[in-house]
A protein has these predicted regions:
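Conserved C-terminal helix/tail region of periplasmic/extracytoplasmic solute-binding proteins
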Residues: 326-359
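Early extracytoplasmic/lumenal segment of secretory-pathway proteins
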Residues: 21-87
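Mature extracytoplasmic/periplasmic domains
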Residues: 267-332
Length: 359
């Protein structure tokens, strides 16, 4: 309760107090981090005088846990996935957040009613909705005969070339089931059975020799750009940046999108707690989340922000069709299920790693 009270007190005031403080934010690097710098950090520093130091990590939850366990917390705000936010909160690593103290929408709607479902947790506040999607190099396939579905991703006979997949079961097993005909709404029911797990691995077996495994978010875009793969799964914001900002000949397949949210959390014993609390409030208000969509194709976690999403920073590209929350993107999308993975992550990861090691 004490940490909740501190947060509530810090967020209640309408204005920020300028100081010579700094706040250390751990995020994911790349185009996503750049979007945070432009939408959150620069205006935050201009308004408060607080310098924002960005630290990139392949998975910010990893250094957060390590710092807490070592008793040496050096960063203040971490951008993590939902499942990690839940786990770290349960482990007592994070402060609790008073949602009533978060900024209301411009029309006065309380934050608890303005954030999308699942965006507010005991110890976390979501900032974006994002997706892992399939992308392909259009130059690798004849016009009029290009891949269109998750099933095509697994069809190397008609759509030849190497495939990029993440080296983890969460964003790999589901796609195998989608490609094998399982509807998105039934993925967790099927994957929760022994038969479903066998079915997923059997489907992965069909392309195992053609897979190039990736771990960091920047890798799949580079794999496509270097011609090492003809198709890959990739974070939708990363591939949007390559397509629009860098004019790469890539396209997105929304079929079988895996949707997730990123959330801001603050560890207990953060060295710049007051600045961290100010940053959390600032970065999750309606306008800042809408502004982020000018720089990357991730959907804001507030309903009031979605109404303000317009053009990309080039002043030409409409962002709405590129959002993971667009109607086309949602047609056969799978939403992350933290409860499922809390129950099954260990066993499926062990099975996945054993499968990787097998011939």
């Amino acid at each position: 309760m004490k940490t909740t009270l501190i947060l509530s007190t810090a967020l209640t005031g309408m204005a920020f107090v300028a100081s010579a403080q700094e706040v250390n934010v751990v995020s994911w690097g790349g185009a996503y981090e750049m979007s945070q710098v432009e939408a959150y950090n620069k205006p935050f520093t201009a308004e408060t005088g607080i310098r924002v130091n960005m630290i990139a990590a392949d998975n910010p939850a990893t250094p957060l846990k390590a710092q807490v366990e070592a008793g040496n917390v050096t960063a203040d705000v971490f951008d993590v996935e939902v499942s990690d936010a839940i786990r770290l909160c349960d482990e007592g690593a994070l402060i609790e957040i008073d949602h009533a103290a978060l900024p209301a929408a411009p029309d006065g709607t309380a934050a608890v009613d303005d954030f999308v479902e699942g965006a507010l947790l005991d110890c976390a506040v979501a900032n974006i909705v994002w997706g892992t999607v399939i992308s392909f190099d259009t130059t690798k396939f004849d016009e009029g005969a290009q891949p269109q579905s998750a099933a095509d991703f697994f069809n190397t006979a008609d759509f030849p070339g190497k495939r990029g997949l993440p080296r983890n079961p969460k964003r790999t097993l589901y796609l195998a089931l989608i490609a094998d005909g399982v509807p998105a709404a039934e993925i967790y029911d099927v994957l929760g059975t022994d038969e479903g797990v066998e079915r997923a691995f059997a489907k992965l077996d069909t392309i195992k020799s053609d897979v190039v495994w990736w771990e960091a978010g920047a890798q799949p875009v580079q794999l496509l750009a270097d011609g090492e793969v003809s198709m890959t799964t990739v974070y939708n914001g990363r591939i949007f940046d390559a397509m629009v900002a860098e004019n790469k000949p890539f396209e997105v397949i929304w079929d079988g999108q895996y949707m997730d949210m990123d959330m801001f959390v603050i560890p207990k014993d953060a060295p710049n707690m007051e600045a961290a609390l100010q940053y959390l409030k600032f970065a999750t208000d309606t306008q800042r989340l809408a502004d982020q969509a000018k720089y990357i194709a991730y959907g804001p976690a507030r309903r009031s922000s979605a109404e303000l999403v317009g053009l990309y920073q080039d002043g030409v590209t409409e962002m709405a069709p590129h959002m993971p929350t667009s109607p086309e993107a949602l047609e056969n999308a799978v939403m992350d299920n933290p409860e499922f993975w809390a129950d099954h992550d260990t066993e499926l990861t062990e099975r996945f790693n054993a499968w990787l090691a097998s011939s």
